[in-house]
Amino acid sequence: LNEYKSPFYLYDQEILLQSIRQLYELSDNRVTLLYSVKANPLLYICRLMKQSGCGLEVSSQGEIYLAIKAGVEKSRIYYSGPGKTVFDIQYAIEKGVGIISVESVDELNLINTVALNKNIIQPVFIRINPNYKSKGLRFSMTGVSSQFGIDEEVLNDNFFDEINLLDIESMGKGL
């Protein structure tokens, strides 16, 4: 370690892979583990995550590029986060990103428009910010308006029926 003259990160590949195996075992392989690329956008780590069976959660065009370069199946790339521009969404759809997380009704409509123009049915995951106040917690993302998800009170009874009319495919709803 003395030969390095600057700070660096040291990863133990075996411990990392063992941790991933344990997570899969604990879930009886019923989950899809996603590695958040923004946590450490290194090509080698992304390739390691792919080899271990993880999908990648990305939040920018650069991270989409990195995931594809790492050889991750496009269906296992999940694009999430607020602030996606029309160019970000176009890029994600053009590159064949597996699922795009929807953070607002406007974003849902934008994804639909881009997908329609490209004659693609785009899978989406709709993130809902529930109108629920937790008791006893100091910090909570529920019960307050947030850039992360669609506020529950914005949704009407026909919201999910209307989604079926769009050129998108709802892969699920998350709180």
Short names for language-model regions:
Residues 80, 127, 149:
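Residues in well-ordered beta-strands of folded domains
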